[in-house]
Amino acid sequence: TTFKGQLTRIVGSKCVEMIEVGPAHTGGDAIVHAPDDRTVFTGDILFINGHPIVWAGPIGNWISACDMIMTLDAENIVPGHGPATDKRGVARVRDYLVYIRDEARKRHDAGMGALEAARSIALDDFEGWGDAERIAVNVATLYREFGDASAPSDAGVLFGWMAQLWKDRK
């Protein structure tokens, strides 16, 4: 079964709500809410203790998805990446997304190129999270969102950028 928007099913005796929240990480992002169990399965909307990677965007959809998860009556949140969390984990991912959006916008508006911008964004508040080099993809996606047609979308180029940043940070 495919769906758009929201789809509710009864599985056994449990109500299960499937909610479309993308595109964000990819074009087909959805979460699953089991209200009776106060549990949300977020798929790739949440990366806990790791830098998320924005392949599709727009990033505003991802921020909105985090906001929506925060409104659900859920105490158990199962991310697509990393350990189970609570709403504090959702808030940290949201904080990261807002931060990189705002920092990338400043650099874009100042005329800085996407790779240079990715290199210059401090990630101190997210130290200890894995895969910091993903900032390269995130900034390129944001630059395209800001209207910069020169920011690459080719996965091969973006993986090359991530490799450069990984080497730079070691």
Features from the language model and the residues they span:
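Sec-exported extracytoplasmic/periplasmic mature domains
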Residues: 67-74, 98, 102-112, 119-126, ...
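Short acidic-hydrophobic, aromatic-tinged amphipathic segments that line or gate anion-handling sites
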Residues: 1-5
